[in-house]
Amino acid sequence: VVLTGNIYDLFFDGEDYVPLMSYLSKKYSSLPNAETSTKGITQVIYELNNAISVCGDDDQKEDLNRTWSKVSGSQKGLEDRLAESGKNSTYALQLLHKICECSRLNNRNAANNLLVMIEAADMLLPEEQISRMSLNDRKRVAIVKDWFSEPEFMDGPDSVILLSESRSGIHSRISRMPQVLSVEIPLPDITERTHFVTNFGSDHGMTFTAGAV
């Protein structure tokens, strides 16, 4: 799913106004897993220039780490790989792909669905003629296209959310895939704007009346 539109606004999470990634993370952390009705969704969050973070309960993280160790055949554990992901966005997308593969293997025994959230997708996967793209841009487009095209991923329980101001900003080899849907986040209406102003005034000891402070 590509979330477009008003993605850089602040959103009320029930307690405070927070960025969209934080809002989504809190909302999805309260949802039960559709298959188990007990374990929640494991969130994997990638924000540009930051390391990938995995959000879930201890059992979910341990399951994922255990499966990673079996599948990767590497002496480096998942935590070490995650720590390295903030240095290279191409590597980060490759790692997200591998984490989804591990999750599908893990789902044979326990349904720990993943929700992968990727910030600034239009910067990671920019719309441009392939011949004019940098090598790393081309690699990232190829990684995501292969990932989203895998039958096991399309038929599996994991989901990916891409954040971009517009769908057209994401490379067409990704954005035009039939399995990629778009949801536009609208601008706040008058009720939402009033709530924000009232909440801001309350936090800062101010009262707003008829547009005046």
Sequence positions of predicted segments:
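ATP/nucleotide-binding catalytic cores
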Residues: 1-213
